[in-house]
Amino acid sequence: KLYGINMERSFKKEIEALKLGDGDIFEGEGILAVTKALLQSGVAYVGGYQGSPVSNLLDVMVQAKDYMKELGVHVEACANESSAAAMLGASINYPVRGAVTWKSIVGTNVASDALSHLASVGVLGGSLIIIGEDYGEGSSIIQERTHGVALKSTIWLMDPRPNLEVIVRTVHKAFELSEYSHTPVMMQLRIRTCHLQGKFIAKNNIKPKISSTNKVGEVAPHNYDLIAHPPSTYAQELSLIHI
C-alpha cells in the first residue's frame, strides 16, 4: 500500500474467467489463456518466479487460492527459478501434471542445474516449463535465446503462434507430448503473445487425479534408474537418443 492506496492489481474478473466451462467464450490476455489451459489440462501443481512477460500467470493463481484449493491445485510462488524447476521432480515418480514458469534467458540459467537433472531422468507425469522469452523486446538485460538450453538438455521447445486458440491447444498438446516421450517440454511466450487480446471456446477444468485434496495411496517404490547418478545416467543418455 502507498499512502493508504492498495497498489496491487486485482484479478477478480480474470479469476471468474478461469471458472468458465464447456462451450463458454473466454476473452482476455494470452498469458491468462495459458492459465485457463493449464486447468483444463488437469494440472496438479504450478510454481514459478515472477518476471515479465509471464508474471500474471502466477499472480492470478495466487489470488485465486480458494478456487485452486477447490480444484486441488497446489500453487507456489518460489524463491527463485531453480526451486521452481525442482518442483517438477514430483512428476518423475508420479503421474501428475505440473507446470512452472519464469522469465528467460537469465531465469533459465538459474534453473539450469535442476533442468539438467530433470531432463536426464525423464518424467512420468506431463511437465511443462512456460518461458517468458524476451529476446529482442527491449526489457531484458541479456539478449540470448532459450533454444540452446533446450537443445543441450534434449527438452522439447514449443513456440505457439500469437493466437489464443493456438496457445491453448499448444498447452494441451505439450502435456501429451511430455507424457508420451517422458520428457519435459518448454513453451516459450514472447511479450506480444502474453499480452495480446483474443478469445477461444473454453472447456471444463479437470481436477487432477492425484492432488493436495486427493493424495496418493502409496509412496512410489525406490528406483535407482530414476536418479541422475552413474551408472543410471548412461542408460538415461542412451534413452534420450532414441526419443
Regions found by a protein language model. Give the residues of each.
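Proline-rich low-complexity regions
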Residues: 50-53, 156, 184, 230
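Glycine-rich phosphate/diphosphate-binding loops that line cofactor/substrate pockets in enzymes
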Residues: 8, 31-43, 90-95, 177-179
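Flexible, low-complexity linker and terminal segments
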Residues: 2-31, 161-241
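Metallocofactor- and cofactor-centric catalytic cores in central/energy metabolism, strongly enriched
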Residues: 14-63, 69-83
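Gly-rich Lys/Arg/Thr-decorated short loops/hinges at beta-loop-alpha junctions or inter-strand turns
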Residues: 8-22, 38-43, 62-71, 98, ...
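Thiamine diphosphate
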Residues: 52-179, 190
